[in-house]
Amino acid sequence: MAREFSLENTRNIGIMAHIDAGKTTTTERILFYTGRIHKIGETHEGASQMDWMEQEQERGITITSAATTAQWKGHRINIIDTPGHVDFTVEVERSLRVLDGAITVLDAQSGVEPQTETVWRQATTYGVPRIVFVNKMDKIGADFLYSVKTLHDRLHANAHPVQLPIGAEDQFSGIIDLVEMCAYHYHDELGKNIERIEIPEDYRDMAEEYRNKLIEAVAELDEELMMKYLEGEEITKEELKAAIRKATISVEFFPVFCGSAFKNKGVQLLLDGVVDYLPSPVDIPPIKGIVPDTEEEVVREADDDAPFAALAFKVMTDPYVGKLTFFRVYSGTLDSGSYVMNSTKRKRERIGRILQMHANHRQEISKVYAGDIAAAVGLKDTTTGDTLCDEKNLVILESMQFPEPVISVAIEPKSKADQDKMGQALQKLQEEDPTFRAHTDPETGQTIISGMGELHLDIIVDRMRREFKVEANVGAPQVAYRETFRKSAQVEGKFIRQSGGRGQYGHVWIEFSPNERGKGFEFENAIVGGVVPKEYVPAVQAGLEEAMQNGVLAGYPVVDIKAKLFDGSYHDVDSSEMAFKIAASLALKNAATKCDPVLLEPIMKVEVVIPEEYLGDIMGDITSRRGRVEGMEARGNAQVVRAMVPLAEMFGYATSLRSNTQGRGTFTMVFDHYEEVPKNIADEIIKKNKGE
């Protein structure tokens, strides 16, 4: 099977947005206009083409990034649909990792919202070029220029319109193209009948003004264009397009488009934007990796003749074919039925079948090429973030970093039959989602599941019921507290047992000190002259790491500390790894009295949108939840309150906000950072955990 589309004509893009900005509808329309769907499904009716898990259809939100392939003007566009709800940021992270470009969808009434900030930040981390689509121009309160202003004010993005809307709200009837300097008028409901027209008289001055602003902004990033502009020469549309493309691909500039996906306006022009301005796999730097045995850094060029290298970015259990592993090919080609090496796990895998995914049907293909995104059936050991590569040319591509869970609940099966199935279900769900964890509490014997938020865990429990037929009772949510040290101290840990038979002897002196918040645990070996032999040093580190899982105050994990092993002693016969492990854990326990341990709690960044009349009540409520109001602003006829609130105080907030605002308020929250728990509250938590 020969390559159908050249690498230059391939686009791997994601569509990212805040919940409800209309992302799924935009994706649907893209699939409709590229001829992949014959009838359009609406998200509010629960029939959307991309949202194919049952819960997604019920809740009208996108949970799993389905990868779909579409074609437009001789180009292949692979689309990864990403969720907009904060509890699913891991899905966004993992899809951004394998994208070359993205469309950020904004709601024309709200502009940039909290989750937009989160996904924008993630995309910046991965260096993903973006174009912006201001959607819902037909909605009451739609304001294109306000939305562009929020890109500058909240994201500090160098974003400029390449289009202007003709009219807004129910008067929205067309789009002005500032590059071509023409306009498009829509004649029918499905948006297929478009007429290219002159720019209407009353919009001409505005179009000239914004075209000049666009040229100025792009010329600042392009010397040749700047010279022409300063000398007053005419800049052709081809030159302008090329300069916008270059600046967009280097992530210095973000073109802004407008439209209404729901009303079928602006989607084809947005597709032109994807082809014109977003990069192909050859436009971006080749991916870097390391050779497993030598740790040498190598690059893998986007080239069919290079050795095969791919990254698995999603694992799913499919009711018909079993385990599906979605992967992005960075270099080389792969035939179905062949063997590859999972270099991350050092396991050989056989690629059974290769499927190209459409939103809800799949096409079996015999070969994939550099730049392709596909799904493999039959991989046994591969999980999210693993590298698959040619057996003779091993490489490990940079893997993904996932945030730690912030919320836990206890879960117990309703019957004995459920018990056995629950273990399997939890294992499969953990394979699919690295931010979901399940473990057994050693003291109570309960199964504890942890995730990124209440909705995340709701959906996990829901999936256990639907997909794995496991009925379970769920306890009240628990906050993932942490512990850390405030002071430095030198502490001794000694473990000596000499009573009959072989003795045990381990003795260490460790200096503990606070580390920067978020830096984690750092261990330093400062032993001089072999007072603790080299072979026992790893045991000291392992002993500390194990003991840190159960902190000294209330049994929560200890984070953000440094430990320097600087002295100790050993016994020729009685010393062992185990003895030094125990000595290190005793040192950590002894640090409790000297290092001033404190509890830390997750602080959430909360944004509440409410009608003005409820402002006083909501501000009071936030303060009563130990929240700090960070700022407020008017958005249309609503007020937006931004605050930092401890997660412990946010349980059940959705219900309380509904009753305080008669259902007219909405809120979003994202984990922001950990900070110290006030002493009076910490004392209560410690008491409760010690069962006093």
From Swiss-Prot:
CDD domains: EF-G (cd01886), EFG_III (cd16262), EFG_mtEFG1_IV (cd01434), EFG_mtEFG_C (cd03713), EFG_mtEFG_II (cd04088). One of its GO terms (cellular component) is cytoplasm. One of its GO terms (molecular function) is translation elongation factor activity. It is found in: Cytoplasm. Keywords: Cytoplasm, Elongation factor, GTP-binding, Nucleotide-binding, Protein biosynthesis. GTP binds at residues 17-24, 81-85, 135-138. One of its GO terms (biological process) is ribosome disassembly. Pfam families: EFG_C (PF00679), EFG_III (PF14492), EFG_IV (PF03764), GTP_EFTU (PF00009), GTP_EFTU_D2 (PF03144). The keyword Nucleotide-binding applies. Its main location: cytoplasm. Residues 8-282 form the tr-type G domain. NCBIfam families: EF-G, PRK12740.1-3, PRK12740.1-5, PRK13351.1-1, small_GTP. Catalyzes the GTP-dependent ribosomal translocation step during translation elongation. During this step, the ribosome changes from the pre-translocational (PRE) to the post-translocational (POST) state as the newly formed A-site-bound peptidyl-tRNA and P-site-bound deacylated tRNA move to the P and E sites, respectively. Catalyzes the coordinated movement of the two tRNA molecules, the mRNA and conformational changes in the ribosome. Belongs to the TRAFAC class translation factor GTPase superfamily. Classic translation factor GTPase family. EF-G/EF-2 subfamily. This is Elongation factor G.
